[in-house]
Amino acid sequence: MMGIQERKKREKERRRQQIMIAAKRVFSTKGFNKATMEDIAKEAELSPGTLYLYFKNKDELFSSLSIRILQYLNIRLGHVADNRKRLTVDQKIEALREAMHDVYKFDPLMLINMFHLQSSETLKNLSSDLIADIKKLSRNSLTIIARLFDEEIHNGAVIDKPAMVLADIIWSMFSGIVLWEESKKMIEGDKDFLEKTLDTAFDIFRRGIKTKLLKKTL
C-alpha cells in the first residue's frame, strides 16, 4: 500500500514540475499579462483542467515560480550568515552584495517577477498557504540580514539604528536597482549596468552606516 502511495506522490510532484517548467517558458516568451492557462497547458502537453488540479489560477502558478527565487536567496544569505564570525563589516556587506547579485544572475526574469509580485494586487488571488510561504521566506531573508547588522551595531562598528531598518534599506536598494535597470533597458536597449550600479550603491551604503571610528580607515 505504501508503495502505491509513494508512486502517486512522486507522480503528482513530477506533473507539478512539468507544469511549472512549461509555465516558465510561456511567461518568458509572452509575459505574464498575455500568457493564459491554455497556453501553459499546451506547452506542458496537458489539458487545461489538469492545471487547475495543481494551481487554482494563473497568479498562483506564477507565484509558485517566484517562490523558487526566494528559496535560493535564503540559501545564499544562509551561506553569508554561516561565515559571519570571521568577516569584518566591509566583508559582510560585500558578501551580501555578491549573494544578491548571484541571485539575480541565477534567474533574472523570476527575480524581477517576484519584485513585481510583492508590490501588486496579485497576492490577493493566492491561496493562504502560498501567501504564508512567501511571507515566511521574505521574513527569513530580512531576519538573516538584520542579524548581520545587529552584531556590528553591538560592537560599535555600525551606527546605532534598528538592524531591521538597515535590512529593509538593503532590500529596498536591491529591488529598486533591479527594477530600475530593467526599465532602463526599454529605453537604452540591452545595455546592462546592474552590476556597476549595485557596486556603487552598496559602497555608498557601507560608507554611510560605519561609525566615525571605522570611517577613518576608509
Residue ranges and their predicted role:
Residues M1-G3, A99-D102, R139, T143, ...:
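C-terminal peripheral helix-coil segments that are non-catalytic and often amphipathic
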Residues K12, M20, F62, S66, ...:
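Amphipathic, non-transmembrane alpha-helical scaffold segments
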Residues I159, A163-A167:
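Membrane-interface starts of transmembrane alpha-helices
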